[in-house]
Amino acid sequence: TKNNVVAVWSGIMLATSLEFWIISHAIITDSMLMLFTVPTLLSAYIGLMENNRRHMVIAYFSSGLACLSKGPVGLVLPGMLLLIWCGLMRNKKLFLRLFPWQGILIFFITALPWYACMYAIHGDPFIREFLGLHNIVRATSSEHPGDNHFYYYFLLLPFSLLPWTGLFFYEIKKQWKEKTSFYLFLMVWCFGTLLFYTLMATKYVTYTYIALVPAAVLAAHAAPDVTSGKKIPGLLAIIPFLLLLAALLAGTFFFPDSQWWPLYIVTAYSVWVLLFRWHKNSHRRLTAISTVTISALLVTVNAGLPAYMHTRSGYIMSDYLHKLPGQHYFFQSYSASFSYYTGETATRLIPILPSEDIQNIRDARWKEKYAMPSITEEEFLKLKKEEPVYLYVSKGNLSRMEKWSLNNRFTVEKEFIDGTIFKLEK
């Protein structure tokens, strides 16, 4: 049936979308948040539409697990989305079904014990750090001011969903007139999530992660049209796919020493199957796109990740800096990998930056994020420096280092892909 086809392709399109594929291979809490947010929303939808209290209890239980994974957002976000959807449905019964006492009870039984234990063990620091800094401050003050733009997520979503972006927008337009309850639910889930995080001051690429689920489900509704040979959905499936391949091929030029020939073979195969055999393989287009996408991403990771890793990891730098005799400092930002790889706890140096750079500096409340030893520029100048002093500056901070008043007192010791080690001249 059509529903079975849509269900299967929903999973395939989600698994092969660019951002989902990347984040799902990373060790971050967003994956666990999605794992429990999806059943929260889908079970709530079934429970509300069918007046099924068991599904509502499952939704509240899942929301409790989501709160244990990444804090109050596990309840606040799905709760807000469901309230908006109920409002659009204009059905008072849905609002009444949304708050069963059994579900609320199971939520507190699931989430409250951990929060109570953390407060009993840590007291006010738990409230101040976890709930205050990592929730309230994150929402009201940007951790990365340069990324705080209203269009951030709406621009990011089309790239995150590649190669299924075209089918996503195709289905949005196709189903717009009918506006079924499930269509409205998916639209609220997707764009409500983007709007929610747009209103938050701190912007992260990973925040669009949850929005990929409804986007993939919408895109999957176009699968029957593509496999039946319809021209427009067929083109909207292939063009974004070719753009993704082109982007991956362009990325190979940044790492010329890697072995990219498998990616070239995969690309040639996809061009032959999808372009030269366009009319003969209409029923296999989605299968070819998903298979080639997985192959291309696997090749990219295996060939490119070892080279790319050194631009994001301080493994080589850490070993070199650790072996240098003397005092070790980090300019403005602290590389956690240094302590991980060496066992040494270095000191973070907080410089006094020129006024024109102040707009890019975080709110002072973010200083509580740094648990490692820190020293101000004034304190650094007062220290007795009887042994050599080395300062590591990440690539992103090199421009600030050049504007720093003490810049001329340092000389380059060693350059790396991800930054530079400087030595203080006596």
Task: Describe these PLM feature segments.
Residues 57, 171-426:
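Membrane-embedded architecture of ER/inner-membrane glycosylation machinery
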Residues 1-232, 282, 344:
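Membrane-integral, polyisoprenol-dependent glycosyltransferases
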